[in-house]
C-alpha cells in the first residue's frame, strides 16, 4: 500500500488530498483539507502581493506538517493559472521552495485539463457517457476548457478565457448595478461561445455535458441532482435552478443551498457558464462527477507505477486531437498515415540505437500527423508556418515544452537543421537531442515514402 498526497494551488482555493493506493482496492481518499485564499489578483496585475505570498507560504507549511503526520510515501504539488500568469513565476516558485520545502509544478493549460480528464475517468460511468456526443466543460478561475467526445474519442478541444475569477474581475471593472450583472454576463458569454459553436458544433449532436468546477458541482451532487449523490441533472431541473438564482438574494441562496456566502458570486458566474453552454448544445443531461485536479494527480501517479488498471486510452485522445488539427489545416490524411507507419517502424526497429521511450514515440507520431499543416498558410515557407501553427495550437495532454519539440521536428523536416538552437532558443540538452533524433527519423521516413 502507498500513501500519496496531492496538493493543488488553485486561483481561489488551495487543497490537499491524502490517498491510499492498493492494487486490490484501487484509490481511496483518506482526507481532504481546503483553504480559501484568492490569488486571482494576478490576472489583473501579473504579480502576487507580499501579503498574499506570506499567506500562501503559511498554508503550504501547514500542508507539509499534515503530510508528515500521515507519513506519505510521495506527493505532487501543482499550481494553475494564477501562478502561471505571474510575470515573475520563477521567483515565486523559488521563494515557495525556500520557505516551505514544497516543489511546485506550474501546469500548462493543456496539462491541467488533461489531469482533469483523468480525474473524471477515475469515476465510474465516464466510458459509457462518452459513447454518445458529450461535451466536457472544465471551469477554472482563469479560463474554461470545452472538449468534445464522440464515440468515446476526443474530437476537439478549445480553451477560452472565461474563468470565474477572470469574469468577476472584468465585471467589477465595468462597475454596473447588481441588477444588470446577469444580462451583461450572458452577453459576454454568448459573444465568445458563438465562435465555438460555429467552429465545432455545426453537425454535432451533444446529448451530455460533464461539468468540472468548484461551485455548481457540489450543488448538483447534493440538492440539485436527480438522486442525491448521483451528480446527474436534467435540462428542466437546470432551468428551474437558474430561475431560483435570478429571483433570490445572496442570503436566501446561502440558506437554501447551505453554501458559504463568499462562494455565491462565483456560483452565479459558474452557473451562468453552464447554462449558456447547455443552451448552445441543447444537451439533455448534465453530469457533475465532483472531481478535482488532485484526483487526476493520484490517478496519473497510480497509472505511472502500474498500481491501477487503465480505464481509458488517453494517449489515443492526444493522437485524435492531433488528427483533428491536421484536418482543420487541410493536411493530407493518406500521406500522414503512410509517414506515420514508416516513421514508427523505424523508431521501433532502432530502440537500442536511439534509446528513446514511449513518450518520444508519441511525439514522433504527432509530428508525422502535423508534418504539412503549414501548407494552409504558405506552400513556400512551409517549415516556419508549420512551427507557428503548432506553437499557437493547444494539443491537450502535451506540455508547452513537448509541443515545442514537435514544432521543431516539423520545422526542420522542411528546413536545414540549426545545430546552434540548443544555445539560442532556451532548449536544454535532453530536449535538443530528442529533436535531433526524431527529426532524423522523420526525414528518413520522408525519403522512404514512395507516394511522395
Please give the residue ranges for each predicted region.
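Conserved ATP-binding subdomain of kinase catalytic cores across diverse folds
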Residues: 23-45, 68
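Gly/Thr-rich phosphate-binding beta-strand-loop-beta motif of the actin/hexokinase/Hsp70
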Residues: 1-28, 128-157, 211-214, 219
Amino acid at each position: 500500500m502507498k500513501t500519496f498526497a496531492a496538493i493543488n494551488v488553485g486561483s481561489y482555493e488551495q487543497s490537499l488530498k491524502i490517498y491510499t493506493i492498493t492494487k486490490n482496492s484501487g484509490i481511496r481518499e483518506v482526507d481532504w483539507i481546503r483553504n480559501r485564499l484568492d490569488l486571482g489578483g494576478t490576472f489583473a496585475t501579473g504579480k502576487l502581493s507580499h501579503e498574499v505570498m506570506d499567506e500562501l507560504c503559511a498554508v503550504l507549511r501547514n500542508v507539509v506538517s499534515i503530510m508528515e503526520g500521515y507519513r506519505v510515501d510521495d506527493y505532487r504539488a501543482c499550481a494553475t493559472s494564477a501562478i502561471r500568469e505571474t510575470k515573475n513565476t520563477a521567483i515565486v516558485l523559488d521563494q515557495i521552495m525556500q520557505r516551505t520545502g514544497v516543489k511546485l509544478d506550474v501546469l500548462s493549460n493543456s496539462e491541467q485539463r488533461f489531469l482533469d480528464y483523468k480525474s473524471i475517468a477515475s469515476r465510474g460511468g465516464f466510458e459509457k457517457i462518452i459513447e454518445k456526443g458529450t461535451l466536457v466543460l472544465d471551469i477554472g478561475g482563469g479560463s474554461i476548457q470545452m472538449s468534445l467526445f464522440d464515440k468515446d474519442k476526443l474530437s476537439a478541444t478549445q480553451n477560452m478565457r472565461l474563468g470565474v475569477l477572470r469574469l468577476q474581475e472584468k465585471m467589477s471593472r465595468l462597475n454596473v448595478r447588481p441588477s444588470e450583472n446577469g444580462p451583461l454576463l450572458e452577453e459576454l458569454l454568448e459573444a465568445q461561445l458563438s465562435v465555438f459553436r460555429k467552429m465545432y458544433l455545426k453537425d454535432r449532436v451533444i446529448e451530455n455535458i460533464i461539468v468540472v468546477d468548484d461551485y455548481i458541482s457540489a450543488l448538483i451532487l447534493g440538492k440539485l441532482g436527480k438522486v442525491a449523490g448521483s451528480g446527474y441533472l436534467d435540462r428542466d431541473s437546470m432551468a428551474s435552478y437558474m430561475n431560483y438564482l435570478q429571483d433570490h438574494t445572496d442570503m436566501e441562496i446561502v440558506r437554501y443551498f447551505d453554501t458559504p456566502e463568499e462562494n455565491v458570486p462565483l456560483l452565479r458566474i459558474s452557473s451562468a457558464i453552464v447554462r449558456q453552454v447547455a443552451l448552445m448544445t441543447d444537451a439533455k443531461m448534465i453530469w457533475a462527477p465532483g472531481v478535482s485536479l488532485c484526483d487526476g494527480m493520484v490517478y496519473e501517479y497510480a497509472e505511472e507505477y502500474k498500481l491501477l488498471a487503465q480505464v481509458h486510452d488517453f494517449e489515443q485522445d492526444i493522437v485524435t486531437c492531433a488528427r483533428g488539427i491536421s484536418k482543420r489545416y487541410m493536411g493530407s490524411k493518406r500521406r500522414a498515415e503512410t509517414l506515420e507507419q514508416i516513421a514508427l517502424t523505424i523508431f521501433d526497429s532502432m530502440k537500442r540505437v536511439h534509446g528513446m521511450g514511449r513518450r518520444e514515440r508519441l511525439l514522433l507520431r504527432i509530428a508525422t500527423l502535423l508534418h504539412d499543416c503549414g501548407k494552409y498558410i504558405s506552400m513556400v515557407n512551409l517549415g516556419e508556418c508549420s512551427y507557428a501553427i503548432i506553437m499557437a495550437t493547444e494539443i491537450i495532454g502535451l506540455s508547452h515544452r513537448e509541443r515545442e519539440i514537435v514544432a521543431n521536428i516539423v520545422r526542420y523536416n522542411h528546413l536545414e537543421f540549426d545545430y546552434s538552437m540548443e544555445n539560442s532558443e532556451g532548449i536544454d540538452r535532453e530536449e535538443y537531442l530528442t529533436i535531433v533524433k526524431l527529426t532524423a527519423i522523420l526525414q528518413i521516413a520522408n525519403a522512404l515514402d514512395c507516394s511522395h
